[in-house]
């Protein structure tokens, strides 16, 4: 892992969290219990404070940053998809930010909301609970259904379990030169399926 103190502030990582060795945490970063931080994530706490609350995840290639005197927060069980950028915003409890989405300064994503992949949430947006946000700029399409929230929670549970699995089952290695016979397949811990397969 790459951890850097910045002007005396050292990242804080709960012992039950998993931070991938290629992720970078700088300065005023606080990571809660059971959090998963994926490969190549960059958390730059060199201006504002960055907080990932318990059970949340920040997947590979994500960026967190914010201005001075602001907190960028992912609340409990928040789910941040691959390549998303969070800048000076707040993501509510049990909300999902889809892959390659951007959430700008002062924006608030309401609890149990879903931001669709590739969406751009403008600075200052003030969301409410269980909104489905879509587009660039993002607009409220409708309320999140119970089925969608269940799907989101299964995905978040996969990442909470992945934090545990990675602490015990991830190790650096050298590649094989050919595929072994009867190569096994990995399995998740829930019955979650891609939305296209539902």
From Swiss-Prot:
GO MF entries: transferase activity
Composition bias type Basic and acidic residues, residue spans: 180-198
SUPFAM superfamilies assigned to the protein according to its UniProt record, in alphabetical order: Trimeric LpxA-like enzymes (SSF51161)
Disulfide pattern: none
CDD domains, per database record: LbH_paaY_like
InterPro entries per the UniProt record, alphabetical: CaiE, Hexapep, Transf_Hexapept/Carb_Anhydrase, Trimer_LpxA-like_sf
Pfam families for the chain: Hexapep
Chain spans, region Disordered: 179-198
Pathway: Amine and polyamine metabolism; carnitine metabolism
GO biological process, alphabetically ordered: carnitine metabolic process
Keywords: Repeat, Transferase
Keyword Transferase appears in the UniProt entry: yes
Transferase listed as a keyword: yes
Function: Overproduction of CaiE stimulates the activity of CaiB and CaiD.
Family: Belongs to the transferase hexapeptide repeat family.
Protein name, UniProt field: Carnitine operon protein CaiE
Lineage: Bacteria, Pseudomonadati, Pseudomonadota, Gammaproteobacteria, Enterobacterales
